[in-house]
Amino acid sequence: MFIDIHTHVFHPKIAHKVVDQLEDHYGIHPVGNGLMEDLDTRMNSAGIDKCVVLAAATAPAQVIPANNWAISIKQEHEEFIPFGTVHTGYKDLEKELDRLEENGIKGLKFHPDFQGFRMDDPALYNIMEMVEDRFVCLFHVGDTLPPEENPSCPRKLAALREAFPKPIIIAAHMGGYRHWDYALDQLAGKDVFVDTSSSMDFLDDAKLETLYRAFGRDHVLFGSDYPLFDAGSELDRLTKRLKLTAADLDAIMENSCSILGL
């Protein structure tokens, strides 16, 4: 089964606005419009069987609406695997985590940079204590700021990993968008999965190969970061640049199946 573990779709009322915001922040012109129908078409063209759909509440008031959206996707679209969201400022986290678990939500997305908290915030540590091993935890990591100044970075995630050994942790963007040297130093060998999203455009072949070897085939997951990138194109580039065999690609896809219980 082929799985894209890093995609985003948005409610039709806000999709255009969010896609524009992504372009403004990252300077990347998105290939997609952020709608489920577009993602569905692209995943079918790429031979992707299922997509993990991610959202991150940028304010406490967004937690319930965002998770309602995730639960509705879970109920209505078997090809999508939605992750839930939490926020350090949300007051009734245990109840909301219970609700997500009861509705079959398998994971949580954390984006400290967009959500307005640091990865070393004690409030995030409190959330992780509640999470235990109930959810797969996918973290956005990295940006253009130096690690010590950025809300997320490989060093902070390594500290989280050490403090909370139970949950499956995924570091997006091959361990840290624009923080790849730090990812090699801080995260490789630390029982952290990495996904390939938003990395093909920014890594040369040598660094991509180094990251792949350092984390190991059994800890690499395929992710496109739709709507920024297209799964078919990203899968093709990943396969060619790393010279992956069919067995390599099957193993990478099996990693996602395994951690998602599929």
Per-region residue spans from a language model:
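Mid-to-C-terminal alpha-helical segments outside catalytic/metal-binding sites
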Residues: 1-5, 15-50, 98, 214-221, ...
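Hydrophobic/aromatic residues located in beta-strands of well-ordered beta-sheets
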Residues: 2, 51, 70, 80-82, ...
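Conserved, mostly hydrophobic/aromatic
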Residues: 6, 43, 70, 100, ...
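Histidine-centered divalent metal-coordination motifs
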Residues: 6-12, 140, 173
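Short active-site segment of divalent metal-dependent hydrolases/proteases
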Residues: 9-10, 143, 176, 228
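A general structural detector for well-ordered alpha-helical segments in enzyme core domains, enriched
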Residues: 38-42, 66-73, 96-100, 123-127, ...
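Active-site gating/metal-coordination segments in enzymes
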Residues: 49-50, 58-139, 143-145, 151, ...
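Catalytic pocket-lining loop regions of alpha/beta-barrel enzymes
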Residues: 106-107, 120-221
